[in-house]
């Protein structure tokens, strides 16, 4: 029972606003722009969770990075630059 509660707490950790949020604000890119630019399955909810700092798995982080790079051509961003966890 204690293990189950611990796992639940660990999966709900939020890391605060991520660098992704600041980058999207700087380039005036909305969540809808990211979803539209994505060639993979990506939802508004995934992007919003990424901006707010909810834990995402590495695959979703990569989808968001790919979509952000497709939405703007000025700079190429890596996962490490977009997320601080």
Locate predicted features:
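A short, Lys/Arg-rich alpha-helix, primarily the initiator
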Residues: 2-37
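DNA-binding alpha-helical recognition surfaces that contact promoter or target DNA
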Residues: 22, 36, 45, 49, ...
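DNA-recognition alpha helix
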Residues: 33-43, 68-71
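Recognition helix of helix-turn-helix/homeodomain-like DNA-binding domains
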Residues: 40-56
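DNA major-groove recognition helix of helix-turn-helix/homeodomain DNA-binding modules
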Residues: 59-76
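Short amphipathic recognition helices of helix-turn-helix/homeodomain-type DNA-binding modules
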Residues: 75-85
């Amino acid at each position: 029972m204690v293990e189950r509660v611990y796992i639940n707490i660990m999966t709900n950790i939020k890391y605060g606003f991520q660098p992704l949020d600041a980058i999207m604000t700087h380039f005036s890119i909305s969540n809808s722009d990211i979803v539209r630019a994505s060639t993979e399955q990506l939802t508004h909810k995934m992007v919003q969770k990424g901006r707010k700092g909810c834990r995402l798995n590495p695959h979703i982080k990569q989808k968001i990075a790919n979509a952000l790079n497709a939405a703007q051509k000025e700079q190429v961003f890596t996962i490490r630059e977009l997320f601080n966890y």
